[in-house]
């Protein structure tokens, strides 16, 4: 099956379903960015269009970013040496931590990986119109202000 998938340049799931879905050609727009995270290995995939993707045998679904008032997910932003210093008052324990901070601009996206028992601090260029998202170690996706 793997060899057939390579020859046809079609993923195995599409072969098994017997259908090939072609996405309509729409311009990519960072306002439509979608996040896909594997629950097994934590792999993160982003796309500006709906895609069919799998990882570790799991079909991935795009997550809808939720708003939260939880103070541990609210960034504290200060200026430092011509850059933004973004920090979170999150305990960052092994049981729960901020795994990724994602910043989205009109033309680019940046993913910063964070780790348990590490201070939740990121330095970013001073750019206006920045949107931020947090993905937790438990796979929750939050839009943060």
Predicted regions: what is each one?
Residues 85-88, 119-127:
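Exposed aromatic-hydrophobic patches
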Residues 11-29:
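Short amphipathic recognition helices of helix-turn-helix/homeodomain-type DNA-binding modules
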